[in-house]
């Protein structure tokens, strides 16, 4: 099965070395994605978003990017790095929100791929 975001070879190698660590990383990544979902749900209907919220988002993007990279997720960490830079530079909120919603969708897909991969490995 081909994956869009999951580097299955990397995950297979890691799961042989430390299955528990892999599960912990997945749980952390899922938690951070959940926090991004909460952030999206709280976005005010009429921006601007205050600088404290923007900084919190940038920090969350940074942490989630690190988790995604640790899990061998492809493509998304680069997009997260770019969005984090946009947020930190004070880019127009409409652009940030649009990119964040797209990225959130990709993160959800990556989580699903990872979960499917792990379940398939457990079923062997």
Please state what every model-predicted region is:
Residues 1-124:
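Two-component system phosphorelay core
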